[in-house]
Swiss-Prot record:
Gene Ontology molecular function terms on file: FAD binding; methylenetetrahydrofolate reductase (NADH) activity
Gene that encodes the chain: metF
Name of the protein: 5,10-methylenetetrahydrofolate reductase
GO biological process: methionine biosynthetic process; tetrahydrofolate interconversion
Organism: Sphingobium sp. (strain NBRC 103272 / SYK-6)
Residues reported to bind NADH: 175
Amino acid sequence: MATATLDKAALSRLFTDYSLEITPKDVEALENAAHMIPPGTLISVTFLPGAEYEDRARAAKRIQELGFRPVPHLSARRLIDEADLRTYLDMLKGVIDLKHVFVIAGDPNEPLGIYEDALALIDSGILKEYGIEHCGISGYPEGHPDITDEKLAKAMHDKVASLKRQGIDYSIMTQFGFDAEPVLEWLKQIRSEGIDGPVRIGLAGPASIKTLLRFAARCGVGTSAKVVKKYGLSITSLIGSAGPDPVIEDLTPVLGPEHGQVHLHFYPFGGLVKTNEWIVNFKGKQGI
């Protein structure tokens, strides 16, 4: 697929301060990709089942050692109680300069402990107590398969209000998607409602079509025939791979002041090295 030529200033703004995400198992891949990543880049550490606190803390420590800024995830429904949360935060403070976290409800349908959702954890006041200065929260431009749009909107406003009361800066990181249109509509909507914090638009790094469609199905991301064709995917053929070029090409010309501060967040489903090679090559082709 040919790369469209985009406005350099607009594209440069979009790529400024982009962020990445890793699992605790990706430390070696991060070391291999580190030379391609700008110093100070925000790199999230997921809170998924199958990893221990020590594994997550070790990954966060390595991120900082490599010159990047670690953003540990806190999955509210996977935490048993306050002591459990403090155990992890204490462990993190012992190995990194803990200033930035990302709080999400998490995937269990029923909480494993006392935190019903992300708001419950934020409202606890523990983040402020531990010196957290910035908290990321989730955004869903295409909605959530298990939560109504009304509940999603209320939850976002409640979390933003709680963080502002506590003097903690916030940003919103969105679910990944293949279509720019719902992202743009959602941005206009939240800005009109007074949500003024930075937004990190989630994009899937280059990956096999099979992998992208699997993650889309798991996350409730739209894969209509029109959307997947434009993205370079095929529902009938799982051969080949695709990258986020089409979404960026659609976003860049139309993002304006009414959309607020916008950055990119890459989910490296096809591998961290592959994602960063794509970023370097894309920026090189565009001359930014």
